[in-house]
Amino acid sequence: MSVPVRHLIAGAFVEGLGAQRIPVSNPLDNSTLAEIACASAEQVEQAVASARETFASWKETPVSERARVMLRYQALLKEHHDELAKIVSSELGKTFEDAKGDVWRGIEVVEHACNVPSLLMGETVENVARNIDTYSITQPLGVCVGITPFNFPAMIPLWMFPLAIACGNAFILKPSEQVPLTSVRLAELFLEAGAPKGVLQVVHGGKEQVDQLLKHPQVKAVSFVGSVAVGQYVYHTGTAHNKRVQSFAGAKNHMVIMPDADKAQVISNLVGASVGAAGQRCMAISVAVLVGAAREWIPEIRDALAKVRPGPWDDSGASYGPVINPQAKARIERLIGQGVEEGAQLLLDGRGYKVEGYPDGNWVGPTLFAGVRPDMAIYREEVFGPVLCLAEVDSLEQAIRLINESPYGNGTSIFTSSGAAARTFQHHIEVGQVGINIPIPVPLPFFSFTGWKGSFYGDLHAYGKQGVRFYTETKTVTARWFDSDSVAGTNFSIQMR
């Protein structure tokens, strides 16, 4: 019998009252782990009302007390680190080591939120005019919503609600219906850390519940991570209903390999960055651009990828796990077939991959294409699977031009021993996050996650300084205190006197 997935509404864990039921499947064998009873419209309304009511008192809570909640929370997350990683592995299929990294990168954002007193500091200028001072203060927005994807069940929720709540907001989390269990456990620990009931709500469901939140007049801001189509929908629907929205969407990330790079380092980093987590990362390297003589390394890249072995999450020798569901597997295999039809050279074929003991798992083996061109579907589309494409160019300038022509701009990297080449690349590339001899340049949380172009819809990015700005409003105060009864005369201009 499957376990019902609970919602957190108004400080209580409850079962959903909506008509729709969604099974939560184990990607290793597609057995049912749990079942979601979606939230009813009345429950979503109750969650918003509870968040709004709690916000009224939470925003008045001293910032030092809010920071102490975050300090207790990060300590609990560290204490339960392995437990959380096992939940991630069970519902997503990630290897245990990868799942531990998922949890840890989320903890780093909570650690950043612990510094909220400093993050909220405003600015002051004395004597902007005679005896007049101007200063800014930072205030929370109100009820904020986070809609998170399946591929990082711990990290991405932790990108959102701890920082938003530390800034004084209340938060409604709508996790992916494919991986809801991690979010429920994160919420349990948050209450255990001393967060007031109602400051965090967890609502499960699909488009119906998302639409209700996107259009609700009491919701002030929406954070989203997911696919291009849904990301565009969330952004346009949310902004049309006067929400502040940050929407992180698709990606197609390139690694430029210069012939002067350390070959062993290149191959090792490329393999992990392309097929790690079964390629289900928005920052995965899906295209390697071989410059000049680096094209001679193709046989060694193939040999290294051929040694990669998918397997179950508790197999310490497994490099990655299954993809999320049979539909994802079918789509990846369709794109591999289309790549062959369009003329790419298939050097490794991951279709039909089998893992002993798990015949019904969503397995895709490591896949490698050479001779890939920008007009091919395997190049254009975000595959979101363990598929690496190799493109060849003659110069760094051609590599930069190739990447800049992509509609996406999430992440990119260059491997080289030349400082001049690295400087040219970072200056001219039209991508928001750049790695120099770093394959997946996801910044630590005191910087922001800064995707560009079609990878991001909005103005303010996640965590870091931009994350604080996203979850707050700035109020500027100009003040004068009179120290005598004298009146200088009526001022009819806009000058300050």
Curated annotation (Swiss-Prot):
Deletion phenotype, per the entry, is: Cells lacking this gene grow slower than wild-type on valine/isoleucine medium, but grow equally well on basal medium containing glucose, isoleucine, or leucine.
Translocase found in the keyword field: no
Q: Name one GO molecular function term.
A: methylmalonate-semialdehyde dehydrogenase (acylating, NAD) activity
Out of the domains of life, which is the source? Bacteria
The catalytic residues are: C282
Q: List its EC numbers.
A: 1.2.1.27
Residues reported in the UniProt entry to bind NAD(+): F150, K174, E177, S227, E382
Q: Which PROSITE patterns match?
A: ALDEHYDE_DEHYDR_CYS
Q: Which InterPro entries match?
A: Ald_DH/histidinol_DH, Ald_DH_C, Ald_DH_CS_CYS, Ald_DH_N, Aldehyde_DH_dom, MeMal-semiAld_DH
Name used for this protein in its record? Methylmalonate-semialdehyde dehydrogenase [acylating]
**Originating species:** Pseudomonas aeruginosa (strain ATCC 15692 / DSM 22644 / CIP 104116 / JCM 14847 / LMG 12228 / 1C / PRS 101 / PAO1)
GN (gene name) = mmsA
